[in-house]
Regions:
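An amphipathic, aromatic/His-enriched active-site/gating alpha helix that lines ligand/cofactor pockets
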Residues: 24, 28-38, 54-89
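Catalytic "initiation/cleavage/transfer" segments centered on a nucleophilic residue
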Residues: 80-105
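Active-site-flanking beta-strand signature of metal-NTP-handling nucleotidyl enzymes
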Residues: 2-9, 50
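A short beta-turn/loop motif at secondary-structure boundaries
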Residues: 41-46
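Short, surface-exposed ligand-recognition loops at beta-strand->loop->(often short) alpha-helix junctions
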Residues: 9-20
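Polar/charged side chains located within well-ordered beta-strands of beta-rich proteins
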Residues: 18, 39, 51-53
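Flexible, glycine-rich phosphate/dinucleotide-binding loops
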Residues: 48, 58, 96
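Non-catalytic surface loops within mature trypsin-like serine protease
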Residues: 10-12, 55-57, 94
């Protein structure tokens, strides 16, 4: 499947709710460990969220994560108008330990 970057900006009053949903995805990924996926989410100072997913497996293992389904429900309504999820295929040009496993994660 490759690398995908998704960018969106929730409404200010829904950003913490969105973060809670994202954290639940990571908690379930940690307990299920579906393999074939590397995934990171960043929250920028302006409230924008950026998700970076490197999916090796086909089909996408995130489709089997219940918390991911809950996160996706209502995502457009949580976002500012015109700031909904914008997924784009991406190519990693360079990385210094970013996609490597870390004992501090």
């Amino acid at each position: 499947m490759g690398t995908v970057v998704v960018r969106y900006r929730p409404k200010a009053n829904r950003a913490d709710e969105n973060q809670d949903l994202v954290e639940a995805v990571f908690a379930e990924l940690g307990s299920v460990d579906p393999g074939g996926v590397r995934y990171a989410t960043l929250r920028l100072a302006d409230g924008t969220f950026i998700h970076i997913a490197d999916i090796e497996a086909d089909p996408n293992p995130l489709g089997n994560i219940a918390a991911f389904a809950r996160f996706q429900e209502g995502i457009v309504e949580r976002c500012e108008p015109g700031e909904g999820p914008n997924p784009q295929a991406a190519t990693v040009v360079g990385s210094y330990r970013f996609f490597a496993e870390s004992s501090s994660s």
